[in-house]
Each structure stands twice: as C-alpha cells, then as structure tokens.
Amino acid sequence: MSINQKRALLVIDIQNEYFTGKLPITYPSGSLANVLDAMDAARAKGLPVVLIQHTSPQPEATAFRKGSKEWELHPEVAARMHDVLIHKSLPGSFTGTELETWLRQRGVETVAIAGYMTQMCCDTTARQAMHLGFGVEFLSDGTGTLSIKNDAGAVSGEELHRAILVTQQARFSRVIKTSNWINQL
C-alpha cells in the first residue's frame, strides 16, 4: 500500500447554507475553489474522497434542515466523484457515524480536512481524528468561516480562522496550504 492509499480527503459540510443560506462563508476568499482542487487532485492520485453532510436534528430548524435547498451539497461538490457520503447531526464527523469504521476498513492512517466552518465542524473533526490515532492535515485555505457576534463578543472571520489554524498546528494537525498539499501527493 502506498502512502497515498493510507490517506483520505474529508470534505466537510460544503452545503448551500454557506453560499445562499443564513451562514455565508466570507474568509478566506477562494476556499471553495481550493476544496474543488483538492477533490480533483485526490481523485487523480487514487485517494478516497469522503463527503460529509450536516443535518440539523431539529425538524423545524432554520438552518441545515433536511430536504431544504440550503441543506443540499453545493452543486460543484455534489457533481464530483466521491467514495462515500457520511451524514452527521453534530459538529464532529466521527460522532454517531460510520466514518471511523469506513476509514479503518480501507487502511487510512491520515485524513486531510477541508470544508466549513473552520472553528466548528472542521476543528472538531480534526481533534476527533487525532484522538482516534489518525494523522491530520488541515487545509488552511480549503477551510473557511465567517464573522461571529453574540453575547460573548465579536470576532472577525479572519481572526477566528487564524486562531483555529494556530491552535490546530500547535497540537492536532499539520496545517498546510491546499496547493502544497496537492504537490505533496
């Protein structure tokens, strides 16, 4: 088994909610194009591509409601070849899903994280993967987020994204630009 056969690309929650819904991704620009490039490169090199789709567990939810247009995968992601589609209802892609079993059955040792949002499902999934013994590669420009304001304060998308990347690199992942990741396949 080659090193590439021991890797998989996880494409997390590239759904219309982040483009035409209530949560438009604003940082970094070009993240969708980088995800698509990563998907194409992974397929060309024979790496498994795993699509992950979030569904709100509340049937009356205003975001990620199953069956809604915003819940659907982005059409450019949906049109690309992938090996499996994993459905989840919590930020961690391993929680309550068959993801770990699917990866282990294929001898995957390292996962690359791409998708949305950096600080939620991507960060949580990367941490879970590390806890489960997988190596983790976090695509710095193939993940994205938006500015957030709530009762605890406000943070820009850029600040939030950078803080997660620094934290990921400190302990959980190898943070890498998509173009460098592709060149190393």
Label for each model-derived stretch:
Residues P24-L51:
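A short alpha/beta connector and helix-capping loop motif
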Residues V11, L47-H54, L139:
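Short beta-strand segments at enzyme active-site cores
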Residues K22-S29, A114-Q119:
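Short, glycine-rich nucleotide/cofactor-binding loops
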Residues M1-A8, L36-D40, K45, T62-L185:
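Active-site-adjacent betaalpha module
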Residues E17-T20:
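Short acidic, Gly/Ser-rich segments with clustered Asp/Glu that frequently serve as metal-coordination loops
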